[in-house]
């Protein structure tokens, strides 16, 4: 689809590019059971990173009225290190941290090409 991405998703993609420069964010958009969807059991560590990220978003950090998918925030990327700005609102700070921790998690998890674009119906019940 050519719909523009929500700004926050774009920011998350930029964070991933910061910690995993060798891969496209697209590699993470449809991986395992949780990177791009969300059901069943995670297939590996990278998929687990996405499950944790989903749970982080769903919790909204406990901030009332916080909508993580559309919330933008301020952060910096310096030589692969992500820092969320102290100027962020409570909601933005929470979402920034969800994304920051996931991007760091992605960098530390092995990428298994066999888990890209898997059959969700058979593998993610």
From Swiss-Prot:
Cofactors that this protein relies on: Ca(2+)
Prosegment residue ranges: 2-7
Active-site annotation: 53, 99
Pfam families: Phospholip_A2_1
Record's subcellular location: Secreted
Gene3D superfamilies: Phospholipase A2 domain
UniProt feature coiled coil, ranges: none
Entry note: cofactor: Binds 1 Ca(2+) ion.
List of residues binding Zn(2+): 30
Matches recorded under InterPro entries: PLipase_A2 (IPR001211), PLipase_A2_Asp_AS (IPR033112), PLipase_A2_dom (IPR016090), PLipase_A2_dom_sf (IPR036444), PLipase_A2_His_AS (IPR033113)
Tissue expression per record: Expressed by the venom gland.
UniProt binding sites for Ca(2+): 34, 36, 54
One CC-aspect GO term: extracellular region
Reactions listed under catalytic activity: a 1,2-diacyl-sn-glycero-3-phosphocholine + H2O = a 1-acyl-sn-glycero-3-phosphocholine + a fatty acid + H(+)
Enzyme Commission number(s): 3.1.1.4
Entry's Gene Ontology BP terms: arachidonate secretion; lipid catabolic process; phospholipid metabolic process
SUPFAM superfamilies noted in UniProt: Phospholipase A2, PLA2
Keyword line: Calcium, Disulfide bond, Hydrolase, Lipid degradation, Lipid metabolism, Metal-binding, Secreted, Signal, Zinc
Major subcellular location class: secreted
Molecular function terms, GO-annotated: calcium ion binding; calcium-dependent phospholipase A2 activity; phospholipid binding
Signal peptide start-end: 1
Family: Belongs to the phospholipase A2 family. Group I subfamily. D49 sub-subfamily.
Role according to the record: PLA2 catalyzes the calcium-dependent hydrolysis of the 2-acyl groups in 3-sn-phosphoglycerides.
Subunit and interaction comment: Heterodimer formed between isoform 5 and isoform 6 in presence of zinc ion and monomer in absence of zinc ion.
Protein name: Acidic phospholipase A2 6
Organism for this UniProt entry: Naja sagittifera
